């Protein structure tokens, strides 16, 4: 063996690096156990702060460098944030209102929603259609793009500036998100921009137990504004007239009547509507009080018909609060106050915004305040914004209530002093992300740049708000378009299941190798497997990649790849020994002859793994990462490390009489002369019939598509007692109703075998961008199940807590927005096509004949069709989920990777025999090549199936569908190598070769 020194050097470096990185995991566990011995939490933290691993690394360094666990193993939250590119463009255009720009934005949004695509390109095309003859510079020669775009700039220059600014906004948003998460204290977060998906950021936060806080923190743009306000008595008459005009059926067309604005009418209107109170304090103590009637009036059809606005909105007097309303009425009120009628009736400089929290001085729950803000700038923006804030702290006021104190820079302090001086006796509204957090009365000029946000806050609220303000403002709004929440208890169960399946699969593989190849070769292969796992974990830790349940599956599957390499080598050695060679020569020839098959099969699998890594997200990337590492490591350990050991032993005259078989495997598939090629008509007919059945099933039964492809929400609910999915479907059938009055699609399927775990799927208001819809959906689910007596939790918060299992709870949840679902669908199609094309080209490059490329690609397509076809035929008939989701697409690509591995081995033997017998009978040559590799095919398939069956039976529900697809892929991929790929290659290759003898004769005669 050549280059032994390089192999030894690489092995030593990998060993040292793996030991170094894995040691941090042991150090962390050691320090945790020592700290746990201390009873005082402060003492525990002081101990952790004082330790230094290896004299250099702090406890925090150890925590960040140890093996990271993914969400499915540790619990936590995974979200994909989408930065609003349309909002970035509107900011760059200074919120232009001309028809050309607004129409182009509307058209681009519609096209993006319908078909996806690059929004900047969609907008530019739409603008050229809506404003023909006009240049982009007319819109974007603004203060925002000063120095980049001038009125004379060409469209190409403007587009370049826009794209650069959009990318800057995304980069800045990424940095803001990272800063917020760091301040939140998440351990080992994974934050990355998704390549090829403009404006999307993936955030993985293991260990998060408060998803509501994270949603609020991640989606908050920190757009802080200070607004002057109207007094409520100035606005009440306008609201009354708006109420009257809506009741009379006004559709917003021009009217001749005017708004009564005299002071007497205003006072009369307020007096009529205003409850008795002092300085905005609205006390509700009696049943007949005005605010208590808010809910009753809203339910009274006659009152709503007579007063569409004021039956829902209770007018108030004093300062900026113009009224109170129940949270359930806010949507209807918004529809009125933002209507075309309202634009004609209400003052043009009026903005109406809701309070961020329910009014804390009322004795009725979920009553919100509506505030009247006054626009005083020509641009329509707030006179003072959050970019002047230099610091924000969570503190307590004189009454002991949590507040957020802020400091401003010099310019901000100057404007703040002017603003407060001009509004003494009035309120100034402090607005964050479009809602009013507080609107305090100004008692006098405030200099020094100090301000405070107060309200109905908890300590956590003020801490998060201060962190959000300190992290900086998001350049554009961000919304969660995909989300997954996994409870820590479920994660612990996944760890247990994953470890059990891994250990059992590993032990069975070791036993199988010894049974098939005897003690010494079997244990050598097993040693290579152990080293494989050690190196894989070490490399994974050095990359700071999180280990997930699919990642564990990828590691287990890579063990199958490692076994395949050893099987190829050992079968070759057995052939050489049977030909009469000595042990040294047989081992050298075995490793040499098996190299090309191992190299090609591993490289084709690697191509598939890279495509998975590039196109996949979340669990698929975790699987692809460990699988790729496992493929590379298994190639190194099987081909080079084991060869070093054999060479060392044989050079010292050890293992000279080593046996590579046992009584079980001695004559396995030896001397067989199956005539596979003569059966191709039968096998092709069977394959065509199967394909017709599968395709027919697609039209008749379809596929069970998950929310990954349809968009929606999944809630995995664990009940105290067994329940039937049909009962859940009945209970929830009418519960989820969209804003337009249509029923949302809702389904329920059983998870596991105990009957206590049900997954509820719904597309309830999935198109809405309102973050509050997430909470609404969970509340509807809780109320419906509670009313039916299926859960007994006291409140929705306990129901949403995955650690509170008694009484029933949501143990995990997933959300996929419609735009993400479309991208996932297209990504799935492209990834499978790219894999097939890449493999076709590689086989063509390596085998230099299109016959092998065609045979392998068509067979791979049939393998994929077979797996998908069985999912179509069997969903709803087997006791586990067969939904088509991202993990399933990963399984399809993995099937392609495994199947091509098998086909390459067969084709490699055919290629070898073609070189040895160029004039031989092609049919006999193909048959002989397949027969010669049958032992390897059976051993590899069996060992891989052992691994997959362990994952399928012991790996848990989340990975069962994946392993089932892989089992189908291994079985039918092996069969297609023999009965589809090889006959196809034979037919194409055979026809080409038949013409060669005549050509050769002609060439000879010409000479």
What does each of the following model-derived ranges do?
Residues 22-31, 49, 65-77, 81-433, ...:
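Non-transmembrane, solvent-exposed regions of membrane trafficking/translocation machinery
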Residues 531, 538-539, 575-596, 600-687, ...:
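Hydrophobic alpha-helical transmembrane segments of membrane transport and translocation systems
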Residues 2-4, 404-405, 409-424, 428-429, ...:
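Interfacial segments of transmembrane alpha-helices in multi-pass membrane proteins
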Residues 12-15, 522-544, 555-562, 623-638, ...:
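Small-residue-enriched core segments of transmembrane alpha-helices in multipass membrane transport
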Residues 1-67, 90-128, 156, 640-694, ...:
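Interfacial helix-loop-helix hairpins and adjacent transmembrane helices
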Residues 560-604, 647-655, 872, 878-940, ...:
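Cytosolic juxtamembrane regions of multi-pass inner-membrane proteins
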Residues 177, 489-509, 561, 581-617, ...:
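Pore- and gate-forming transmembrane helices of large, multi-pass membrane proteins
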Residues 204, 448-452, 460-507, 780, ...:
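Juxtamembrane "pre-transmembrane" interface segments
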């Amino acid at each position: 063996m050549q280059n032994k020194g390089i192999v030894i050097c690489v092995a030593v470096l990998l060993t040292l690096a793996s030991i170094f990185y894995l040691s941090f995991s042991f150090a962390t566990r050691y320090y945790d156990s020592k700290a746990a011995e201390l009873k005082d939490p402060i003492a525990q933290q002081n101990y952790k702060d004082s330790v230094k691993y290896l004299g250099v690394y702090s406890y925090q360094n150890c925590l960040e460098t140890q093996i990271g666990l993914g969400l499915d193993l540790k619990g936590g939250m995974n979200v994909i944030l989408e930065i609003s590119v349309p909002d970035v463009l509107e900011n760059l255009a200074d919120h232009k209102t001309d028809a050309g720009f607004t129409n182009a934005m509307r058209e681009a949004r519609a096209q993006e929603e319908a078909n996806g695509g690059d929004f900047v390109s969609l907008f530019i095309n739409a603008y050229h259609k809506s404003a023909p003859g006009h240049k982009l510079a007319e819109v974007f020669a603004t203060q925002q793009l000063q120095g980049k775009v001038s009125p004379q700039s060409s469209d190409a220059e403007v587009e370049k500036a826009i794209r650069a600014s959009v990318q800057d906004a995304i980069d800045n948003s990424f940095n803001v998100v990272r800063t917020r998460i760091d301040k939140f204290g998440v351990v080992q977060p994974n934050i990355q921009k998704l390549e090829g998906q403009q404006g999307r950021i993936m955030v993985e936060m293991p260990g998060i137990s408060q998803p509501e806080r994270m949603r609020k923190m991640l989606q908050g743009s920190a757009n802080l504004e200070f607004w002057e306000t109207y007094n409520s008595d100035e606005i009440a008459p306008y609201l009354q007239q708006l109420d009257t005009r809506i009741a009379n059926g006004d559709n917003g067309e021009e009217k001749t009547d005017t708004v009564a604005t005299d002071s007497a009418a205003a006072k009369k209107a307020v007096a009529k509507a205003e409850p008795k109170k002092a300085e905005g304090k609205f006390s509700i103590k009696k049943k007949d009080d005005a605010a208590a009637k808010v809910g009753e009036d809203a339910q009274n059809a006659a009152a709503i018909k007579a007063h569409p606005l004021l039956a829902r909105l209770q007018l108030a007097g004093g300062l900026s609060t113009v009224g109170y309303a129940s949270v359930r009425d806010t949507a209807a009120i918004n529809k009125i106050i933002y209507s075309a009628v309202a634009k004609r009736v209400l003052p043009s400089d009026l903005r109406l915004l809701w309070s961020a929290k329910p009014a804390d001085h009322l004795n009725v729950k979920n009553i919100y305040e509506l505030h009247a803000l006054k626009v005083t700038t020509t641009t329509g923006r707030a006179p003072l914004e959050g970019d002047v804030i230099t610091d924000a702290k969570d503190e307590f006021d004189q009454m002991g209530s949590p507040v957020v104190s802020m400091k401003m820079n010099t310019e901000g302090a100057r404007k703040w002093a002017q603003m407060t001086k001009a509004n003494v006796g009035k309120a100034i509204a402090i607005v964050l992300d479009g809602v009013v957090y507080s609107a305090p009365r100004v008692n006098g000029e405030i200099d020094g740049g100090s301000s405070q946000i107060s309200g109905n806050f908890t300590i956590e609220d003020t801490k998060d708000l201060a962190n959000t303000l300190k992290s900086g403002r998001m350049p554009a709004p961000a919304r969660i378009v995909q989300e997954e929440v996994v409870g820590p208890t479920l994660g612990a169960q996944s760890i247990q299941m994953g470890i059990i399946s891994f250990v059992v699969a590993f032990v069975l593989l070791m036993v199988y190798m010894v049974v098939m190849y005897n003690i010494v070769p079997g244990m050598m292969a097993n040693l290579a497997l152990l080293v494989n796992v050690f190196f894989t974990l070490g490399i994974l830790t050095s990359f700071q990649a999180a280990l997930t349940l699919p990642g564990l599956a990828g590691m287990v599957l890579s063990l199958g790849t490692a076994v395949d390499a050893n099987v190829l080598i050992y079968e070759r050695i057995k052939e050489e020994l049977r030909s009469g060679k000595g042990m040294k020569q047989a081992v050298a020839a075995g490793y040499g002859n098996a190299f090309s098959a191992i190299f090609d099969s591993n490289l084709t699998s690697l191509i598939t793994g890279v495509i998975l890594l590039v196109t996949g997200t979340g669990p698929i990337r975790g699987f692809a990462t460990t699988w790729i590492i496992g493929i590379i490591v298994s190639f190194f350990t099987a081909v080079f490390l084991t060869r070093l050991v054999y060479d060392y032993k044989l050079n010292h005259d050890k293992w000279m009489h080593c046996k590579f078989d046992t009584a079980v495997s001695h004559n396995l598939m030896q001397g067989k002369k199956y005539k596979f090629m003569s059966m191709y008509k039968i096998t092709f007919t069977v394959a065509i019939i199967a394909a017709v059945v599968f395709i027919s099933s697609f039209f008749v039964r379809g596929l069970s598509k998950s929310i990954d492809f349809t968009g929606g929400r999944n809630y995995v609910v664990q009940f105290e007692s067994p329940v039937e999915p049909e009962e859940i479907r009945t209970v929830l059938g009418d519960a989820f109703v969209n804003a337009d009055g249509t029923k949302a699609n809702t389904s329920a399927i059983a998870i596991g075998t105990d009957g206590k775990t049900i997954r509820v799927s719904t597309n309830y208001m999935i198109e809405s961008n309102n973050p509050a819809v997430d909470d609404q959906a969970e509340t509807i689910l809780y109320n419906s199940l509670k009313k039916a007596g299926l859960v007994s939790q006291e409140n929705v918060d306990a129901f949403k807590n995955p650690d509170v299992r008694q009484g029933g709870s949501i143990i995990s949840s997933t959300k996929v927005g419609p735009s993400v679902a479309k991208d996932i669908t297209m990504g799935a199609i492209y990834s499978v096509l790219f894999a097939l094309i890449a493999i076709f080209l590689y086989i063509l490059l390596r085998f230099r004949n299109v016959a092998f490329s065609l045979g392998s690609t068509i067979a791979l397509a049939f393998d994929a069709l077979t797996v998908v076809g069985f999912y179509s035929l069997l969903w709803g008939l087997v006791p586990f989920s067969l939904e088509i989701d991202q993990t399933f697409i990963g399984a399809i690509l993995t099937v392609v990777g495994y199947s091509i591995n098998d086909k390459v081995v067969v084709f490699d033997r055919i290629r070898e025999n073609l070189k040895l017998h160029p004039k031989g009978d092609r049919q006999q040559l193909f048959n002989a090549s397949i027969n010669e590799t049958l032992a390897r095919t059976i051993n590899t398939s069996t060992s891989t199936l052992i691994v997959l069956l362990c994952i399928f039976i012991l790996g848990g529900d989340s990975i069962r569908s994946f392993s089932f697809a892989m089992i189908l892929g291994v079985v039918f991929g092996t069969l297609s190598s023999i009965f589809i790929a090889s006959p196809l290659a034979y037919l194409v290759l055979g026809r080409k070769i038949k013409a060669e003898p005549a050509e050769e004769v002609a060439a000879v005669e010409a000479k």
